[in-house]
Amino acid sequence: MINLIAKSLWNRKGTALLTLFSIAISVALLIGVEQIRKGVRTSFSSAVSGTDLIVGARGGSLQLLLYSVFRMGNAPNNLTWESYQDFKKHSRVRWTIPFSLGDSHHGYRVLGTNHDYFKLFRYGNRQRLKFSEGKPFSGVFDAVLGSEVARKRKYRLNDPIIVSHGTGSSSFLKHEDRPFTVVGILAPTGTPVDQTVHVSLEGITAMHIDWESGAPPMEEDRIDNEEVLKRDLTPEAITAFLVGLRSKIHAFSLQREVNTYREEPLSAILPGAALQELWELLRTAETGLRVILSLIHISEPTRRTPTPY
């Protein structure tokens, strides 16, 4: 019987090899999809840790999570500096990290923030950001690069970079008159930090100080950089901010305060709850893909395995 099967397979070796190849591909796809799924979940889950709330302009929780943490999409609106200060000084708040987004550099997002970002931001298992070269920004036109930005653009310390207005990968509007200088490069994190250009909030304000119309100023209206540095560069608005509480038991009550804030419409989300919402959204697609690949795997032997004779 075994000899008969062996002869049959030999006589149909082309079909048998094709069947084995198809099965191998099906199994590889199944394993690959599962590995990608786990990798995506791990990457998303490790992007921010130790943050109790994320606050931004009123909108969907997923939208707020995606643009503030993952640099995906855009904010529906900004929130005022005064509102940020109100919650920064709240008795239940231990720390905050402000974010200002809206510009880019060769497709990489530019993030305006302050020194607390380098001191307090955590990712993964509450890991701190580390520098592979240089130091945090101190001047208005200093920039700190994520590891991928530095590697792919081949930047070194003291190199100049030009920021583009807006978030398009090929923006035609550039802040060419206000270049930044690379003063630091962060160590790899495996998070969106690696794909981010970090500048100070004052740097964001300085870039746009004569762009009131959203376009470059006419030559006669241009403000030179020496004059810019003499101005008050406190931002009028930011995009979002991270919140660390003195006690996690206050998370829901402060979230409610933010969501019912009378000065302007704001939203506060719990990062873990927003991530769970994202997993629920993706679960249907994941399940459908696994079913399709499983059916392919099951059907291949039935459809192509040669019958002994």
What are these regions, as identified by a protein language model?
Residues 12-16, 47, 275-295:
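Loop-to-transmembrane-helix entry motif
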Residues 174-181, 185-286:
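Mechanotransmission and gating elements of multispan inner-membrane complexes involved in transport
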Residues 32-119, 135-139, 230, 254, ...:
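Hydrophobic, regular-secondary-structure patches
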Residues 1-10:
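A short amphipathic helical element positioned immediately N-terminal to and/or at the very start
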Residues 104-115, 124-216:
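Hydrophobic secondary-structure segments that place a key small or acidic residue at a functional site
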Residues 14-39:
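Short, strongly hydrophobic transmembrane alpha-helices
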